[in-house]
Amino acid sequence: TDTGLYGDGEAAIAYGVGSTAAYGMIQDLAKLIIGMNPLDTEVIWEKLYKSTFWAQNGGPIVFAGISALDIALWDIKGKYFNVPVYQLLGGKMRDKLRCYASQLQFGWGERKTPAYQIEDYVANAKKAVSEGYDAIKIDFFTFDPKGYRYSSEETTRVLDPYHVHVVIDRLAAVREAVGPDVDIIMENHSYIDAQVAVQLGEQAKKYNILFFEEPTTPNPKMNKFVCDKLNIPIAQGERIYSRWGYAPYFEDGSIQLIQPDIGNCGGLTEAKKICDLAHIYDVGVQAHVCASPL
């Protein structure tokens, strides 16, 4: 700002493809708000949404750009009033947050060993639990037993018994290793399609998974199809943007846990509104993040 205050923000497009586009979007959007009062976060958010053309019904790049600027503006606001941002949002609900050890298929600890064989999954799970984690998240269908990544052709068709057993045997072994008191989140990264999600979900039920994350492409109708077939909580949100993107999932009851990423759903301004909507529909919230410590 012209008074010397500055804010930090971040676009959550650090993985996958698109970081260069997000950087360019931030630059373009920033030009629109030069000269505005940084404390007017609602006014600025609406300007970014309405005056850019592409934000309405927009996707990850435009909302990542909005998010980065919005987070920075809230940082400025907190510094200006000399209070934590959570105070400006209405106050904190708790002093501690439960955390889970995530993406154990890539390994865990200082010397990460990707999981190919069943014993690799078990070893990584045990490492995390030994550090005090009482919840772990694993994508059991990333690597085949030889260490190769599964192709989309292999994961988006009705699975033969062999591939079902590969996934479920890994899950079963991890459940046996960590016991009944550690929650297991079954991650999928939307690699599988709806039919495969139902196949795997039916088999996964007996292992009492906490939730089934991104079981298929983020699409309300496909999510509803999976949800109706399974009695397992479904989680989505890493790739859903703005309250307009979330509304269909709330309205049809196809999601039980949302995972909005503050760095790409529209920033703190929009994330608060998304979470308020979730509260109306008794949908749980677990903020997603896969970015820097910021």
Segments predicted by a language model, with ranges:
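Proline-centered loop/turn at the N-terminus of a beta-strand
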Residues: 84, 98, 183, 233, ...
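Ligand-binding pocket scaffold of soluble enzyme catalytic domains
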Residues: 8, 40, 80, 98, ...
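Glycine-rich beta-alpha junction loops
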Residues: 13, 142, 290-294
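Conserved, mostly hydrophobic/aromatic
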Residues: 4, 29, 69, 82, ...
